[in-house]
Amino acid sequence: MNKENINIEYVNEENSRFLKNILRDDISEDFVDSLDVVLEITNYGIEHNCKGHTYAIKYDEKHIGFILLWEAIEWSTDPEIMKKEPFYRLMAFIIDKRYRGCGIGSYVLEKVILQCYEEYGIRPIALGVHKDNYRAEKFYVNRSFIKTDFMEGNDYYYFR
């Protein structure tokens, strides 16, 4: 994997067409929302001037994934600890299955977090991981996210 070949760009109408071709048939929508849901969330964030972005991920000029990191809107199911200060919510992160395991996801995650911090300020980050998604659990724990006992539906909350 050559980091110089990785690019991230804001998701827009044009590049979202290419994101539909990402191979993710091994990841249930119980684990990560569909692209259509991600685009709905993205449009909501844009319309309401939320802090954050949804990014398209490219490798060698080919669209291979997307990641959504936005300022969190409080949910009734959020733990009390999250209601004390503003935070970001990572809501979707998919890498085409042909490009996993080579460091692209790790690189993109850190780059997007850093960009969000630089643009909007440092805040805690929360995300949910389905209780049966052990691969995602390992990925996030290895990147300094802490698994909690709090759950929203079938998802455990993770904080960083």
Go through each PLM region and give its residues.
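Acetyl-CoA-dependent GNAT
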Residues: 2-6, 10-98, 109, 115, ...
